[in-house]
């Protein structure tokens, strides 16, 4: 891999424990650059980077910079941060995360995966197919790849696969050779202001492509389909389950072992087509079939053999916090999932419905008061595939409460919209007892959210087992369970 042309000295990452920042830091470290950082939380990403030999301070103060010559920040870091203030007082370059990612992308041919939902899984699937083809890509992802135990790794090949985060608009600056768009929904309106601005950003993302590149776009999503006619003078490949898709999924079957489907690949210019039959994907849900079709579209256009595509998908090991099984207790299976937008929640619960013949119990920790408030009606209707819903306190993520955006309001909204079984969770400690009371063997408990609920999901199987054990002892002693 080519290096940056000048000696840039030590790089200091403010908020290095974030999923996007940690990936960039890891790749730069593996390239031989001196990397250091700070974070408010001593989280799993911080521990992983420390194990690589990267020094990280907990807390933010000017002294953390040391002899740093460049400071890298995410959009979440404020100008009032003492490390940022000290960097600017010392006339050091202060670089946004996306700008640093863009500089890394210039060192290779790059594939950037964007979209409101599904981009982490799709990025992982693209990387998997390039790996299967022996292309050994560099990868910077927004989630931990189960096969690697990290969200980023440095490959020896000429390609880089990155997740393009649209949350602050900076993804429009990424110099991709190939772009993929999964879907476009109203999200991050606190930054964009209007949905039209979101649409404009995605158009700019595609228009940045060079003439020799191409975009792979999900035609099943109405917003993406509506954008295609506006993207003149760019090569576009579409994918989806629609008969209009260039990369079309057919004969889809979904079950407890994942998905099985065929893919019909059509060349619009030449008029020919071929079929890859019997693809098996060890993931649940129609939405993951779509994610796989996007990855297939890129792999096929890059000339990767059909047999390699089939084998690569079959051996895909998934991404942490994407329908991740954390354990079982008394026949009850606990699932951890990052889904926190109504579209994501609905897709995950539909996948859960396909994965079990028994009940699906959703435990949701709404993420941000602003999101719950602006999408309240959507939240009230996205749990239809859950037999029971448990609503926890809103994870504030630094926000102040908004009247009408609370767990009580959401629970009442679900009931008003026709949901038959809704529970308000008193606190985290009450979850094991509640689940023990309402769950039966064979049920799936799906924990949903982008906040601290992942910790709950990982602890729940053992906690549930303990509650079940106490209940059995009480029953044997002749008391009420």
Swiss-Prot record:
Where ATP binds, per the record, is at: 115-121
Q: Which keywords accompany this UniProt record?
A: ATP-binding, Cell cycle, Cell division, Cell shape, Cell wall biogenesis/degradation, Cytoplasm, Ligase, Nucleotide-binding, Peptidoglycan synthesis
Q: In which pathway does it act?
A: Cell wall biogenesis; peptidoglycan biosynthesis
Alphabetized Pfam families for the sequence: Mur_ligase, Mur_ligase_C, Mur_ligase_M
Kindly state which reaction or reactions the protein catalyses: UDP-N-acetyl-alpha-D-muramate + L-alanine + ATP = UDP-N-acetyl-alpha-D-muramoyl-L-alanine + ADP + phosphate + H(+)
Which cellular component, as a GO term, is one annotated location? cytoplasm
Localisation: Cytoplasm
Q: Name one GO molecular function term.
A: UDP-N-acetylmuramate-L-alanine ligase activity
Give the top-rank taxon of the lineage listed in the UniProt record for this protein. Answer: Bacteria
Q: Which Gene3D superfamilies match?
A: Mur ligase, C-terminal domain, Mur-like, catalytic domain, NAD(P)-binding Rossmann-like Domain
Q: Which GO terms describe its biological process?
A: cell division; cell wall organization; peptidoglycan biosynthetic process; regulation of cell shape
Which EC numbers does the record give? 6.3.2.8
Q: Which family does it belong to?
A: Belongs to the MurCDEF family.
Q: What does this protein do?
A: Cell wall formation.
Q: Which PANTHER family match?
A: UDP-N-ACETYLMURAMATE--L-ALANINE LIGASE, UDP-N-ACETYLMURAMATE--L-ALANINE LIGASE-RELATED
Q: What is this protein called?
A: UDP-N-acetylmuramate--L-alanine ligase
Species: Rhodospirillum rubrum (strain ATCC 11170 / ATH 1.1.1 / DSM 467 / LMG 4362 / NCIMB 8255 / S1)
According to the entry, what is the taxonomic lineage of the organism?
Bacteria, Pseudomonadati, Pseudomonadota, Alphaproteobacteria, Rhodospirillales
């Amino acid at each position: 891999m080519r290096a940056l042309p000048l000696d840039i000295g030590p790089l200091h990452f403010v908020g290095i424990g974030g999923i996007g920042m940690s990936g960039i830091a890891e790749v730069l470290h593996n390239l031989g650059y001196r990397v250091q950082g700070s974070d408010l939380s001593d989280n799993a990403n911080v521990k992983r980077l420390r194990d690589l030999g990267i020094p990280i301070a907990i807390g933010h103060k000017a002294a953390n910079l040391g002899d740093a010559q460049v400071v890298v920040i995410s959009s979440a870091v404020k100008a009032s941060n003492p490390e940022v203030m000290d960097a600017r007082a010392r006339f050091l370059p202060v670089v946004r995360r996306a700008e640093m990612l863009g500089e890394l992308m210039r060192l290779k041919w790059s594939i950037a995966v964007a979209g409101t939902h599904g981009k982490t899984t799709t990025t992982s699937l693209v990387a998997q197919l390039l790996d299967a083809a022996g292309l050994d890509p560099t990868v910077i992802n927004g989630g931990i790849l189960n096969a690697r135990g990290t969200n980023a790794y440095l490959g020896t090949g000429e390609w880089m696969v990155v997740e393009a985060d649209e949350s602050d608009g900076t993804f429009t600056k990424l110099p991709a050779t190939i772009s993929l768009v999964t879907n476009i929904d109203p999200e991050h309106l606190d930054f964009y202001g209007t949905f039209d601005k979101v649409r404009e950003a995605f158009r700019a993302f595609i228009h940045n492509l060079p003439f020799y590149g191409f975009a792979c776009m999900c035609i099943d999503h109405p917003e993406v389909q509506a954008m295609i006619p506006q993207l003149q003078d760019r090569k576009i490949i579409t994918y989806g389950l629609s008969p209009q898709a260039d990369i079309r999924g057919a004969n889809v079957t979904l079950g407890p072992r994942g998905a099985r489907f065929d893919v019909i690949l059509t060349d619009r210019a030449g008029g020919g087509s071929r079929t890859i039959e019997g693809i098996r994907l060890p993931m649940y849900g129609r939405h993951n079939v779509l994610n796989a079709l996007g990855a297939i579209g890129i792999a096929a256009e890059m000339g990767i053999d059909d047999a390699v595509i089939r084998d690569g998908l079959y051996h895909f090991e998934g991404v942490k916090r994407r329908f991740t099984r954390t354990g079982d207790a008394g026949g009850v299976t606990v699932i951890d999932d990052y889904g926190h937008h109504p579209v994501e929640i609905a897709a995950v619960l539909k996948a859960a419905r396909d994965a079990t013949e028994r009940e699906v119990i959703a435990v949701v920790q709404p993420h941000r008061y602003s999101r719950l408030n602006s999408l309240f009606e959507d939240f009230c209707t996205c749990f239809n595939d859950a037999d029971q819903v448990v609503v926890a306190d809103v994870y504030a993520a630094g926000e102040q409460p908004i009247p009408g955006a609370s767990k009580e309001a959401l629970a009442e909204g679900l009931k008003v919209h026709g949901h038959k079984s809704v529970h308000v969770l008193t606190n985290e400690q009450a979850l094991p007892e509640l689940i023990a009371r309402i769950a039966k063997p064979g049920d799936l408990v799906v924990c949903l959210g982008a906040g601290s609920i992942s910790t709950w999901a990982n602890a729940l199987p053992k906690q549930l087992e303990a509650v079940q054990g106490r209940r059995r002892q009480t029953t044997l002693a002749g008391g009420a369970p």
